[in-house]
Amino acid sequence: MKTKNRLLNSDIDFVNESIPYSRSDFNNMLTKLSSNDYYQLMVNTYIGTYGSAKFFGESTKTLPENFNWKTITEFDPPSIVSKKKLISEPENQYLCGNCWAMSTVQTIGDRFVVAGLVNWVPDLSTTFAMLYYPQGQCDGGNSAKLMRQIHTGIGLASKHCIDYSWCSRNIECKTDNSLGHFVSENKSYLLPSKKGCYYNSKHYIYKIDSRPKIISGYGTLNTDNEVLNNQILLKQEILANGPAVGGFLVFENFTSAFTKVNGGVYLENVSNYGSGKPVEFNPHINKYSGNHVVSILGWGVAKGIKISNTQFSDVPYWFCRNTWGKNWGDKGYFKIAMYPFNKKSQFLKLVSIVDHEGHTRRNSGVVICNVSETPILQSLPVIPSTEIPKSLDNSTNFYSQDENYEIKNNSQNEKGFPKGNRRRTTSSDTQIVFIFFLSVVILFIFIIL
């Protein structure tokens, strides 16, 4: 039983499972950023300063200083607002070390939303991914490898097929300690042993177009200039196509406390987060806990925050969604300083460190995937009733709702995005329409007579 110093995802290697972000990807992204909605967002954000710019790809100055797929602002055009309302909220992995799966499936679902392929919250199933593409399950895994397997495999189903009840309703897995999975025993034995859904029903299958694309981490350690260029590229990619998956080193000071002080931005060299005192810095104080994978939803700049014991500065950060529940951090979200303010705990520069056992650990990297096809409704295997948790997160009806979702053609909306958060067509809806039509006919006959 492993109960101490379990270094999850201790050597995340996105490189061998991905292909480089290509010139074609770059051109497609710039084409999307030149659309009217993004132009409107840019002009409103920088009115009077960069109003003459044609589109985001022309200059780094045309990117908004702050943007993320969670926060709705007064500058967002209606289509962007509609999509932001459908972006996944933070989930909780509890004592299962599956950030590699949970962050990946949520990010993929978000990309279906941003692409305008669904008009509901996808709620893709982490459990489905862990059963069909297991890797280490609760003992860690590789997000890029998972994306590759999803591309070549059946795809992904939502929580309407199978949800996280096996963990969230089990005292052996559920916890209030967000960092508990780093030292807990491997909880993979709690998972259902069979692939499939809880009940016999049709479910949407979500597929990705190709192997994952790596934005950073391809080849050897990046130079500083490459890192800065990749920061611009990642911002453009997130804005155009949705959140990305990022891996980074976690140190012992990465606790919920940092989100409450000093602009709420995580800086790796702070030694006293949570002490109630002004932040203090010590570059040698923090120990390595493991590697972590999260969803990168956007970026921003924290103005005039403390960066050393004697200095203050504006600090650019990535806005991220964690997998440690809504009671952690800023309701499940956090800001992490970009390179070079963080040199080790960051996304875009590959780093190697020596852990407390003398092992070299290598991490950092960002991967994305392309989506272009609407989900397809199909029947899936059903797991034995003995495999269904005794207590479920949702009512029985929840596990058949995929059949009631209707994918609307984007052309029905002049903004290119379906109206409404969720669209269902049920037998009761049909009955209402029929009764209304029949009433009109009877009234018409009565008037004629």
UniProtKB/Swiss-Prot annotation:
Major localization class: membrane
Q: Which GO terms describe its cellular component?
A: membrane
Q: What InterPro entries is this protein classified in?
A: Papain-like_cys_pep_sf, Pept_cys_AS, Peptidase_C1A, Peptidase_C1A_C
* Subcellular location field: Membrane
Q: Which PROSITE patterns match?
A: THIOL_PROTEASE_CYS
Q: Name one GO molecular function term.
A: cysteine-type peptidase activity
Keywords for this protein: Hydrolase, Membrane, Protease, Thiol protease, Transmembrane, Transmembrane helix
Question: What parts of the sequence cross the membrane?
Answer: 429-449
| Catalytic site | C99, H292, N322
**Enzyme Commission number, as recorded:** 3.4.22.-
What is one GO biological process annotated to this record?
proteolysis
| Topology of this chain in the membrane | Single-pass membrane protein
The similarity annotation says: Belongs to the peptidase C1 family.
Query: Tell me, what does this protein do in biology?
Result: Probable cysteine protease.
Q: Under what name is this protein listed?
A: Probable cysteine proteinase 224L
Q: Which organism is it from?
A: Invertebrate iridescent virus 6 (IIV-6)
